[in-house]
């Protein structure tokens, strides 16, 4: 069982996009029973709020629903619950480390690193470009899936 937690600042744009894109990839491969996939925020700013309309709209364009998702915050105990804690950018990693304190098992990484790329997933909250964010999230999620399953 692979347990993956995607993390961004507010859990309304990038990390829920990654959560639901990864769930879609896994479901289409017939492997949903082999994965636990979730997302959360490092901040408290959006806790309880639904996914941003731009993310919701982009996911709907590709046939993915995220209707019931609400923002939640990362907790220190999440470190023990998940095998992979996947951040969208370096600031997320700094804030993850502030919450979990240490990463002795090497669980924390950047999403794009799983696609053999360096850099961050741009935050569409600031850029307004949900298409570019989706493209990069999809690349990262496909890379992570291949890395874990060999498919």
Regions inferred by a protein language model and the residue ranges of each:
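Conserved active-site segments centered on acidic
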Residues: 1-81, 146-150
């Amino acid at each position: 069982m692979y347990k993956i937690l995607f993390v961004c600042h507010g859990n309304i744009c990038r990390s829920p996009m990654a959560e639901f894109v990864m769930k879609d990839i896994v479901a289409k491969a017939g492997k949903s029973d082999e994965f636990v996939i979730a997302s959360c925020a490092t901040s408290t700013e959006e806790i309880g709020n639904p996914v941003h309309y731009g993310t919701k709209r982009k996911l709907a364009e590709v046939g993915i629903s995220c209707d019931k998702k609400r923002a939640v915050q990362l907790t220190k105990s999440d470190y023990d619950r998940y095998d992979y804690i996947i951040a969208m950018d370096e600031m997320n990693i700094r804030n993850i480390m502030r919450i979990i304190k240490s990463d002795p098992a090497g669980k924390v990484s950047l999403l794009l690193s799983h696609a053999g790329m360096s850099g961050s997933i741009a935050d569409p909250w600031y850029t307004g470009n949900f298409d570019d964010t989706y493209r990069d999230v999809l690349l990262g999620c496909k890379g992570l899936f291949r890395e874990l399953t060999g498919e």
